Amino acid sequence: MEKRELYELKDNKIVRKRRFCPRCGPGVFLAEHEDRFSCGRCGYTEFKRKN
């Protein structure tokens, strides 16, 4: 995935499309999988809720 796919421009402002890792801080995005979000740097994982 390229960096330009992680951001978009709205009203002349840069908006991040992905969530940040709460452990690593800003700049480290969580990867989105089918059933979870995970950080490739520290291994932090959040599971998605089934509705």
Curated annotation (Swiss-Prot):
The keyword Ribosomal protein applies. Transmembrane segments: none annotated. SMART domains: Ribosomal_S27. Binds 1 zinc ion per subunit. GO terms for molecular function: structural constituent of ribosome; zinc ion binding. Its cofactor is Zn(2+). Zn(2+) binds at residues 21, 24, 39, 42. Belongs to the eukaryotic ribosomal protein eS31 family. This is Small ribosomal subunit protein eS31. The gene is rps27ae.
